[in-house]
Amino acid sequence: EELYEAGKIKAIGVSNFLPHHLDTLAKTAKIMPMVNQVFLAPGELQTTVVEYAKKHDMILEAYSPLGTGKIFDVPEMKQIAEAHDKTIAQVALRWSLQHEFLPLPKSVTPSRIKENTELFDFELTEEEMKQIDQLDGVVGKAKDPDTTQF
């Protein structure tokens, strides 16, 4: 908070905070975090975290937006990608953006890095978004920060 107030940092962020963690933080914080970095990917839409973030104008930074690679084995994602002449990765990243998440895909391959930026010449339909939202569990589940040793 001191660094933020002094203008030395532009934002305050947390990682893997659930709503009850943020509520606890709110009791003592002068400035609430602007960003919460959490595992968000097609198949893992952490609804309570998403709703809390929207209610409190908090940006959700989606780490592992490609479901640690598991998303490439999901037939529904392949079907949607083919319908748009896009890759599964592009569809997953577009899904993130349309949910107003900030996706952080990891790649060291120049062609994939470029491909990951080619997301603004198409949109997923409302029906496609719902279809992807309902892919519960296909990429695994986010670790519970209350019980996981990080």
Model regions and ranges:
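Beta/alpha (TIM)-barrel catalytic core signal, keyed to glycine-rich beta->alpha loops juxtaposed to Asp/Glu
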Residues: 1-142, 146-150
